[in-house]
Amino acid sequence: MGRLFGTDGVRGVANRELTAELALALGAAAARQLASGSAPGRRVAVIGRDPRASGEMLEAAVIAGLTSQGVDALRVGVLPTPAVAYLTGAYDADFGVMISASHNPMPDNGIKIFGPGGHKLDDGTEDRIEALVGDAGPRPVGAGIGRVIDAEDAADRYLRHLSKASTLRLDGLTVVVDCAHGAASSVAPRAYRAAGARVIAINADPNGLNINDNCGSTHLDSLRAAVVAHRADLGLAHDGDADRCLAVDADGNLVDGDHIMVVLALAMREAGELASDTLVTTVMSNLGLHLAMRSAGITVRTTGVGDRYVVEELRAGDYSLGGEQSGHIVMPALGSTGDGIVTGLRLMTRMAQTGSPLSDLASAMQTLPQVLINVTVADKATAATAPSVQTAVGQAAAELGDTGRILLRPSGTEPMIRVMVEAPEKDIAQRLATRVAEAVSAAR
């Protein structure tokens, strides 16, 4: 059996790989590891979920695991992942648990665990939790068993926190918000309206089965059409758990996480808020971001893929902005993890501050043509290190020289290898990416 924890918690098809039994065992193991050193008194874990149908089953199982170890479960209901992270700190809980598979299809689900203060766990802590899975250990009885408490004020507390993200009123801005029929369906429109924007919410009617179904940050067509139809200033797309945000301008053109980071980095540097004039991003960010930041005199620190690694670098260097091309944007002053709604508020604040349309702000970065091909494989390690694959990568890199780059990356959550190529021309990137992808496919 491989490692349970991937780059973003434990994921799998609900009731197949991610069973109620495993969820119970993970809840109990997390309780033993993360609440064992707590001060005297009741131990508490915050637990939330996105609206997918299997979340109810898994929430019940995790709560059973928590309470079996004497930990009280503070249930916050359907809220975004960053809300659970924030509330873990706000309620002074020992740790937090979010049940979500983010942008994945509805049949999938996942379990993310946050430590004290709402920070994602490091690899070592995850390994220690995993080692305890299946080891029930001592169990309390009687009054020592944990209780379940519903946090009635959770959404309102999170909304008050979100209000800090917008330093200017957004009156006059019209935004279309695609909530992906996910965890943001209630709170995102409320947050944007509270800041003054005129909000048109789409895909905001979750029924447990329609999350991420041709909508949200991975399917932007309906958002583009709605922005143009309503003559909105911009559109914002969240994923199922609202830890990411992508945007489209008034003409429906994509403004991805790289462009958003450039816009926010320039704004924060202008305000004296960009610590050490440094932006943290991952190896997936487009070369155009690096060129734009170099031109502006801003240093770029690069990490592995996954917002947890961005957060680790932000904390290590005491930096103030980081993120991913996929739309996970992290601002430590406003949260311990990526928050799509905070990102949307900050982006609109910059528009209100400058009076500029999003297209003008995003033009500070020119994207190099990029091709990304996902290749399904049986064994990620074997396929990635095969001599034939390494030869194909070397040949492509030699052809590109310093005019582009190639990246071969095993997915942290799915059985696939991602082949990414950037080049001066799209046809060059497509040709080289296809060649390498064919080598990976043949080696799988």
Curated annotation (Swiss-Prot):
Belongs to the phosphohexose mutase family. Its EC number is 5.4.2.10. The keyword DNA-binding does not apply. Pfam families: PGM_PMM_I, PGM_PMM_II, PGM_PMM_III, PGM_PMM_IV. Mg(2+) binds at residues 102, 239, 241, 243. Activated by phosphorylation. It catalyses: alpha-D-glucosamine 1-phosphate = D-glucosamine 6-phosphate. The active site is at 102 (phosphoserine intermediate). Binds 1 Mg(2+) ion per subunit. This is Phosphoglucosamine mutase. Catalyzes the conversion of glucosamine-6-phosphate to glucosamine-1-phosphate. The gene is glmM. CDD domains: GlmM. InterPro entries: A-D-PHexomutase_a/b/a-I (IPR005844), A-D-PHexomutase_a/b/a-I/II/III (IPR016055), A-D-PHexomutase_a/b/a-II (IPR005845), A-D-PHexomutase_a/b/a-III (IPR005846), A-D-PHexomutase_C (IPR005843), A-D-PHexomutase_C_sf (IPR036900), A-D-PHexomutase_CS (IPR016066), Alpha-D-phosphohexomutase_SF (IPR005841).
